[in-house]
Curated annotation (Swiss-Prot):
Modified residues (Phosphoserine): S204, S1111, S1330, S1331, S1345, S1438, S1488, S1598, S1603, S1666
Protein name, per record: Lysine-specific demethylase 5A
Domain ARID span(s) in chain numbering: 84-174
Region Disordered, residue ranges: 203-229, 1327-1346, 1407-1435, 1662-1690
Amino acid sequence: MASVGPGGYAAEFVPPPECPVFEPSWEEFTDPLSFIGRIRPFAEKTGICKIRPPKDWQPPFACEVKTFRFTPRVQRLNELEAMTRVRLDFLDQLAKFWELQGSTLKIPVVERKILDLYALSKIVASKGGFEIVTKEKKWSKVGSRLGYLPGKGTGSLLKSHYERILYPYELFQSGVSLMGVQMPDLDLKEKVEAEVLSTDIQPSPERGTRMNIPPKRTRRVKSQSDSGEVNRNTELKKLQIFGAGPKVVGLAVGAKDKEDEVTRRRKVTNRSDAFNMQMRQRKGTLSVNFVDLYVCMFCGRGNNEDKLLLCDGCDDSYHTFCLLPPLPDVPKGDWRCPKCVAEECNKPREAFGFEQAVREYTLQSFGEMADNFKSDYFNMPVHMVPTELVEKEFWRLVSSIEEDVIVEYGADISSKDFGSGFPKKDGQRKMLPEEEEYALSGWNLNNMPVLEQSVLAHINVDISGMKVPWLYVGMCFSSFCWHIEDHWSYSINYLHWGEPKTWYGVPSHAAEQLEEVMRELAPELFESQPDLLHQLVTIMNPNVLMEHGVPVYRTNQCAGEFVVTFPRAYHSGFNQGYNFAEAVNFCTADWLPIGRQCVNHYRRLRRHCVFSHEELIFKMAADPECLDVGLAAMVCKELTLMTEEETRLRESVVQMGVVMSEEEVFELVPDDERQCSACRTTCFLSALTCSCNPERLVCLYHPTDLCSCPMQNKCLRYRYPLEDLPSLLYGVKVRAQSYDTWVNRVTEALSASFNHKKDLIELRVMLEDAEDRKYPENDLFRKLRDAVKEAETCGSVAQLLLSKKQKHRQSSDSGKTRTKLTVEELKAFVQQLVSLPCVISQTRQVKNLLDDVEEFHERAQEAMMDETPDSSKLQMLIDMGSSLYVELPELPRLKQELQQARWLDEVRLTLSDPQQVTLDVMKKLIDSGVGLAPHHAVEKAMAELQELLTVSERWEEKAKVCLQARPRHSMANLENIVNEAKNIPAFLPNVLSLKEALQKAREWTAKVEAIQSGNNYAYLEQLESLSAKGRPIPVRLDALPQVESQVAAARAWRERTGRTFLKKNSSHTLLQVLSPRTDIGVYGSGKNRRKKVKEIIEKEKEKDLDLEPLSDLEEGLEESRDTAMVVAVFKEREQKEIEAMHSLRAANLAKMTIVERIEEVKFCICRKTASGFMLQCELCKDWFHNSCVPLPKSSSQKKGSSWQAKDVKFLCPLCMRSRRPRLETILSLLVSLQKLPVRLPEGEALQCLTERAMSWQDKARQALATDELSSALAKLSVLSQRMVEQAAREKTEKIISAELQKAAANPDLQGHLPSFQQSAFNRVVSSVSSSPHQTMDYDDEETDSDEDIRETYGYDMKDTASVKSSSSLEPNLFCDEEIPIKSEEVVTHMWTAPSFCAEHAYSSASKSCSQGSSTPRKQPRKSPLVPRSLEPPVLELSPGAKAQLEELMMVGDLLEVSLDETQHIWRILQATHPPSEDRFLHIMEDDSIEEKPLKMKGKDSSEKKRKRKLEKVEQLFGEGKQKTKELKKIDKPKKKKLKLNVDKSKELNKLAKKLAKEEERKKKKEKAAAAKVELVKESTEKKRERKVLDIPSKYDWSGAEESDDENAVCAAQNCQRPCKDKVDWVQCDGGCDEWFHQVCVGVSAEMAENEDYICINCAKKQGPDSPGQAPPPPFLMSYKLPMEDLKETS
């Protein structure tokens, strides 16, 4: 609650509680008075309520905005509040008093705030007055009551101000100043003089603050510092002009006091001065001595003329010291004596009321003014100002006397003159459909007062404000004061639009309390205006009322909302801003008794009535048929009371002596002419008049107040004779009879005993009858409706309860949450059914249900007392309880015991089968048992389970430790553990695992013992399987390490054998390589070959069902555990392999016989036709493209000798599947295999292969031991030795010559040159002769890696010594054993790989023999470019020997083993062939070579790779074949042609035919080469700058990317591979476009730039001996070929 300030008003406003708010539905909203009647019991407790219509109910605003003009009222806010107005009236009286005393009131300022003189006066008066407060020294307490802090001298200051300002006024009010005015005696005078001398009051003008109060109250208050402070402070000057809003007058500050004084007549100090004064003439007076007239009216003396004051009102004279209180000095203004002052102050004041504004507004102009005022006052937009802030500010302003805020309010504007805000059917204009709906609505305020149920509908006169709505246009702070409606009727207010309207209401029961509080707090106002609250001009702070116990409620009415006030409910409020509202009164039937009470109240207050209440009642009774039944009943009651009261009054008047009476129709007399002169009540039934004044009349309540004439002279005027009143009453009773009958029936039915109760149907009929006849909704009506509603509700609940009882199973299964009745509720429900005012059919069934519940309770108690819970019995009780559909307290307990019983059943069932008693099951049982309610049986079972679980877990953990132990436990220990755990009645997985591990260990040990005790060793697969099975067994197996070591040794042997035999990334397994081939004749990739092999196998199976698969030797080896069977299978596969190879060779050799259809024949692994260079496999005799297979590697191919082509033995990848290790290596593997106690399929296959190889070796040695072959081998050896020696000697001479040239350039060494030459030569010769068996070192840069050689040819270069030593036939067959020269300048083409060096020796020997010289010499010829003649073979063998050797060679090549005998046989067979015989094909296609003699760098990468591959083949095979290359290049435009060396004569004949055409074509080619030589030179220079040339390596047969210049090998046969700065290139201009190092071909940089270079190959083609050839160019003729190249051409 807010605190109350010193003046009695709240310091800070606290909003009261909110009133109820109702939101009717559309159905409820259709009948407004019925809805208000239903909410009246709740809403009348707060006096006011708010109704929110449905959202869609929005009536249009029907006022004419443009023509709506009104004049508002002016409201000064601080004059509205009662207590503030009392203070202002007090200050007016005080200011008027001092003005009449010739002084201006100055209100002091104490502690920086204006002193509240009214509060000071009241507080001092409450403490006994000035004298007592001063005597008892209570001024400090007075200051505390005023809110001042003690201890600052405030008490003395307040005393001074009170004594100077209020004390004279107090004396005046008490009448002391008038005492003795007519008693002039000397004693009084002396007393007064003494008092003056003792008091001597000196006013302090510095402290004073003037407040100029004009004759009319202006409510302006000036502070003490106005005169000086305002002038100094500019802000205060502004505040004088601008207030808070357009109508604010400003602060309570007046203009500056005028300093001019009013000229006054002073009393002179001597008589002579007195005659000089100008006196006012009086009419009717004599001219006498004026000095005699001036005597003091108090003391009667005329002395002390300077102290005599002349009154400006009556001209009486008074000494200043004779006045009470005495004046210290002569006043400056007009002065009046106490007598005149009393006369002036006692004049009656005008009644307070609102003034009308001068300006007339439209809605727009008023809205603009209102919005501007609010926005300026709060300094923010109007819509942003909170309602709470406006509310607090309003109550602060109305309680402030310092701030004078003026607002305007357009109130009480009659809608009859200005139009209603609701649509109204007046016939002036056609209405829209939506407007017509609202025009007929009962909530339309034009219709509500005249509704059928409304009492005001029976008043014909349009009462403005009651039947005719009033309009209200408000602005911020405009307010309506505390009031109640006329005749205490209802009121309803609708806010059409705008900002909210704040309401405060007090309920009717507190109306008199509010009036008493206001009289108590503002008695001065009620003394002059007893009916002040009916004038709507007084407001009081709700907090003050609440402080005094008056209940106050509030609400904010927003646009579109109704506010209803109830009879005699005081209400007030204010507007938050600009808005438009409409209000009207209405009266319902329940108002009639209240209206009668209001008229009696008005009679006591002598207040005028708006209409005659008696006339209204009798008017309704006169036409009872048109009355509503409820209204008729209420009228009947009121009419009965009025009849009785009227009969009593008339009888009392007759008894007083009135004898005359006369009937008069009072309704025809105007209301103001039939008012009682005593109480002002409008008379209708009767009145009393007198002949002395016929216009004057009184009611029968005041018969004596009419006049003093005797009663016999007075006349009783009446409207109805007394005998007519019962007939009127009877008519109303007949109308209300049906209602009375209904009331009696309802009352009897509702109060009937149990045995005589009506049925529910009868009560429904009564209720429907009341609703149809529209009986009033009184207590009986509501009681009947509530009874029917209660009975229906009970019937529904009973029906639901009984239906759920029947459907308990379905409802329990649904799982939905339902609220059941408790037993207490069921009992209460049965009691409620019994106490119903009617009977329903389900009562007996509900009673039976209660009996079942009680029976269930007894049986449940017995079941819960059992020692061991019985699940079946408990389940039956639970089903019974669930079927009752009642919340039974025993049911949860029964469910708990059922869970316990089921858990015990589950435990017993589980323990009965130990196999089901797992750890998880026990844990789950324990966990589920822990959640059960405590029970001794459950606890016992839990203890047993826990013990069993603990023991089981202990054994499980022990078994787990044994299973995971490292090292493993022995079998004996584990058996003991298993035996001990047998007695535990539980399922133990770890113990079972341990038991299974023991069983597996026994089985595994038995298998191992069986294998070890067998006749044969076990296969590796068996041991691996045993090892894999025994390793995870968690038992210590004594035999397992032995088995694992055997497996590891066998695997190591197999891996070693695989590294020995298998190539890198080989697609064959070791067993396939060691076994005879089954895929002979199958070509393609790995997948295709395997598929074809399977097809062959299927075909073989169809031919011979008993024949095993060719490719499944390994399966045979694995299946054949007997050694003899393994050997038999191997022999069978061996024979099939040889037969298949014979067939394949025959088929491949047959391809050469179909030259005419050679384009249709498929070759190579790609199975395409012949093209490009092609190689022939020496084993399968098929031809292979050089781009499809890897070329055979030769250690001498870097230097490129022309006669090496015969030495190359080519085996295709299909025939040569492995590395083919030497037999010595295989023998070491077999020795290791014999040490293994394990059988391997690979080992047995290796044994078979070794036996096969040794068998073949024996056959080969036997064949080579014949005389014919022995002599052939000897001959080859001699030729090879001689060739090697000659080559070494020539190279040594070259080295010596180079050293001598270097020494010749040094003068110091010239004397030693002869000896140096001789010693060097001797050292070389001796080294050649003394070291015939040393092996040279191979240059790592210029030879292929050993790994590549091993992959390609099946033996290691490092195994050369072993090869030589192992040969028992010819120890000196290999040329690389003869000359131990380590210089890199030695011609390295002589030190070739063992497979081919013998072939080189054979060729050299044959050539030297043909020349008849001891040193190898070239065949004499005219030019180096002239080809030699064809030479015969070196050796010639008999056909039988040759066939035998060829058969051995084929079988030896099938072996995947390197044997020396294969090399011997190969050399012999090669020596039997002519040296010029070709073993390759060269297929020419169209004109791709002849028409493009110069190949540019612009070719794509694929063309470059193809060219590099071609150059590789040419270097390997071509230099010795230059004579035949031209024969192969046959120009056939659209057809490939295959040239075979089978028939040399055919080739020569064809060559002769083509020479003429070829000559012309070559001429054209030479011209094209000369034209493009410059372009080649530019390209060469660019390549030199980049140091990277597109010159392929001769060894890069796979077509890899080009190497850098430093590592590239040129096209020369003896490339020296120069390094870094010596790498300079030159390109052949003869047509082959090959690149050569300048160092390798002896060309300087100047020669390469200025002249053409033609390589040896091109020079051979263009030699002078060739027919039709031009002589070589001068550069070639004068150029000396290097010695190496000349040797190569020999």
